[in-house]
Structure formats: C-alpha cells, structure tokens
Amino acid sequence: MSYKNVKNLTDDFTTLGHIAWLWANSPLHKEWSISLFTKNILPAIQHDQYILLMRDEFPVAFCSWANLTLTNEVKYVRDVTSLTFEDWNSGERKWLIDWIAPFGDNNTLYRYMRKKFPNEVFRAIRVYPGSTEAKIIHVQGGQINKFTAKKLIQQYQEELIQVLNNHKKIVRG
C-alpha cells in the first residue's frame, strides 16, 4: 500500500474543486453525470495529465489528455466512458479528454497547450451542446512542421479506420 504526501493530496482535492467548478459552469459539462466527472477527472489528476489555468487565484480553463495505445484509442472512440485508469497512460497517441473554458478563455488555453506541447499532435472527440453527434478534431503544437503533423494525423486516422473496419468484418462474421 502506498500513501501520498498530505500536501499533495490536499492540492489534488483543491484541484478537483477548481475543475468541478469549471465543469458546473460549462454549458456542455454541467449536464453530465458525477460518475463521468470522476471517470474523466481523477485519472487526469493522478497521472498529472492536465492543465488548470488560473487568473487571480480563480480557475478559468481546464484541459486533460490521455496517452493511448491504438487498442485503447479504438475503445475510446467507440465509448468515451470506457477508459480505465491504466488506459490513460498506455501509449503515445495523445487524445484531449476534456477542454473546459466557460469564461471565454478558450484561446488562452489553446495557446498554452500549443506552447507546452510544441511538437505534438492531439486528437479530440468534439461534442457540441444539445447534439448527439461528435467529430474527431486535431490540434497540433506551435512548432511542429505542418507536413509532419499532417502525415502523423493521416497515419493515425488510417490506422484507426483500419482497426474499426476490421472489427466490423469480425462482428458481421
């Protein structure tokens, strides 16, 4: 059994409170369940795979990400609630899990992420409030070569589509 330093645990609970407040103020997230909140937020905090932007000691934006294997990526695309704690840091394929900026700080968070991950490519499942449809979007770091980013995005997309199509063939049998 392992124990966390009390200060860090206190910091984690403070962080959790800040994120909960942002979640409650997001037109999209405030309609989601507390079980989804814990499934999306606790692993991000525990793996230190999040950004929480503060202004004047006030939380204004939050972003979390998971590093997935292709297998876990397929699982996530099929069911965004499927990730386990272990899945969050299982591979090199970066996915934005949550992006919350309910007070107009979306561009600030975007610039921060591009600077923090200058040579990375992220994907995200974008859901719009009131919609039952989603789409996969791409976000790239501020210094990655556009050709390299495009090539990587295309590779990831082709691999994902191939696995999804193979699964359909198996299911249809």
From Swiss-Prot:
Pfam families: HlyC. It is found in: Cytoplasm. It catalyses: a fatty acyl-[ACP] + L-lysyl-[protein] = N(6)-(fatty acyl)-L-lysyl-[protein] + holo-[ACP] + H(+). GO terms for molecular function: acyltransferase activity. Its EC number is 2.3.1.-. GO terms for cellular component: cytoplasm. Transmembrane segments: none annotated. The active site is at 29, 98. Its main location: cytoplasm. GO terms for biological process: killing of cells of another organism; toxin metabolic process. Keywords: Acyltransferase, Cytolysis, Cytoplasm, Transferase. Protein-lysine acyltransferase that catalyzes fatty acylation of the protoxin, thereby converting it to the active toxin. Belongs to the RTX toxin acyltransferase family. Homodimer. This is RTX-III toxin-activating lysine-acyltransferase ApxIIC.
